[in-house]
Amino acid sequence: MKIALDPYMFRRVPLTDLPALVADLGYSWIELSPRDDFMPFFLHPRADRAQVAAFSRALNAAGVRVASVLPLYRWSGPDSGERQAAVRYWKRAIQITADLGVDTMNSEFNGRPEAAAACEAQFWRSMEELLPVFEREGIRLVLEPHPDDFIEDGRAAVDLIRGIDKDWVSFLYCAPHTFHQGGDIEGIMKYAGPLLTQLHIADSFDHRASSGLRYIVNPPGSAARIHQHLDIGQGEVDWDVFFRTLTEVNFDGIATVCVFAWEERARESSAHNLEQIRHYLAKHGGTA
């Protein structure tokens, strides 16, 4: 298992200083999430060859590697122009990933729940254009359902991924989205089976609990989706079930700490979660 850090809470750290910081926190792997100076959210990548080369040198010097690159683009529309732009952005992001020597990219479906059928059609159109590019560059694609996306349910996401029918396209289970994707950690992981190749690890409260009043959102009846990315142990994800099931399905992929809630103590948070992962792996017979 590759235990990686999503360094989003450290996004203001210069890119070439990031690998040394990650190593100092005890991690050997990075999941490279969007940064304004490299691959921004929903915009064309900013990185040039010189920046990619400098980042590669910094990674080598720190003894840290990139496990996966995470871009977020509107490749499922529903706006056709946004979809076409997203495909262009994806092609550049794939090239940068290949230049970094990274073999995995992960992302979301990035559509809208109120236009699910139209967004799925746009998603398949993007797949027709991009699957050959992924395949040519030898890069794996890992997809996750997300709150407020056209696919939010874990099993439905597994079904769609299975329909892509490529052995290098697989499923990411995001722990802080547990209560939006069905609330069944064990069932979804086992349903995914060998398609489960990547994890996002953070805690969250169950928004459905206490008669739906764990959170109070105004105005009443709002369709807003609420979740957190907290430290392990601060929410209601059942971590014993989570790690026990990983052992049962022989998971040996990428496990990324993606806590966003504590920028004011980001170093302590990152170290704590690495320690907690090791604790639960030891408890349930897993390996890192």
Please report, for each region that a protein language model flagged, where it lies by residue:
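Conserved, mostly hydrophobic/aromatic
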Residues: L5, V22, I30, L59, ...
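Catalytic domains of carbohydrate-active enzymes, especially glycoside hydrolases
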Residues: L18-D36
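Glycine-rich, proline-tolerant flexible connector loops at the mouths of alpha/beta enzymes
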Residues: S33-S56, N110-A115
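Acidic/histidine-rich catalytic cores of soluble enzymes
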Residues: K2, W29, R125-E236, G285-A288
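Active-site acidic/histidine proton-transfer and metal-coordination neighborhood
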Residues: T16-D17, R57-R65, W75-Y173, E268, ...
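Active-site beta-loop-alpha junctions enriched in small/polar residues
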Residues: D6-F10, S33-R35, P71-R74, N110-R112, ...
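Conserved beta-strand positions in the central sheet of alpha/beta enzyme cores
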Residues: E31, S68-L70, N106, V142, ...
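Short, acidic/polar
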Residues: R12-V22, A85-Q95, Q181-M189, W239
